[in-house]
Regions:
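Short, C-terminally biased terminal segments at protein or domain edges
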Residues: 1-133
Length: 133
């Protein structure tokens, strides 16, 4: 069955979500790929610093979505979606730092921030509404 939360559509399967079918997870995976491409533009000096931190942040988003979906309670789901949302906010700040330092330009950063905003809204809906049993 699936539910609509405004523009946010979230899929559920029994008491354990099929995380691979979750639209928010799919969008987070797309963001991860896009961020990896963007971080290739950072200077070599940032390879083990800012670039590595950005990649950890972006990987944390779909990873926590999957872990939360694999749990059996709304409290667990909400916890991991909250962690994923926090990682999204951390990533937003890191991307803004890249733009401020002229490592990435606004054409690189703006689409990533747009993707992040949509993912955060979807995560907020999951945090608010939990899962349907």
């Amino acid at each position: 069955m699936h539910f609509h939360f405004g523009l946010v559509e979230v899929f559920y399967k029994a008491t354990t979500m099929n995380y691979r079918k979750m639209i928010v997870r799919q969008k987070a995976m797309n963001l991860t790929e896009a961020v990896y491409v963007a971080t290739r533009k950072l200077p070599p000096a940032e390879l083990y610093a800012l670039s590595a931190q950005i990649r950890r942040s972006v990987v944390s988003i779909p990873s926590n979505i999957a872990e939360g979906a694999g749990r059996n309670t709304d409290n667990d789901l909400r916890h991991f979606m909250t962690v994923a949302r926090g990682s999204a906010t951390e990533l937003e700040t890191q991307l803004m730092i890249c733009e401020m330092l002229n490592y990435l330009n606004s054409n690189d950063v703006a689409p990533l921030l747009k993707m992040l905003d949509e993912i955060r809204r979807m995560l907020s809906a999951l945090i608010k509404n939990g899962r349907a049993d």
